[in-house]
């Protein structure tokens, strides 16, 4: 248990210190409970990828063009630690943080740690690109779903 806590703390700090973020694309938020029609830019930290067999851990950052208000809390960016199952094309969020400013800066206005089940990769270009980067797959050309 103690080793898991130390690993988790190390992973949290490694995703924050001098992270090199690579933009995956622009999208529009269309989630239940969140104001829709909001532009969002999604980034991943390729340098912070941690692989162990078919399992990979990678940070994802989202910047919102206007503040997102959810459960009475506003944030301009969110950072999440995702675990990917490269063999079975699944993922789960291990933890996430909401920040008062873009690029995961400013105050942390909310955070949560998850221990949920793996979910299939959503057939969405941004989520699929994240999985491919995390798992070391070559990004397919536009229009090719393989």
Question: For each of these PLM feature ranges, what is it?
Answer:
Residues 1-3, 19:
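Absolute protein N-terminus
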Residues 17-146:
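N-terminal secretory-pathway/extracellular module detecting exported/lumenal segments
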Residues 4-13:
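Sec-dependent N-terminal signal peptides
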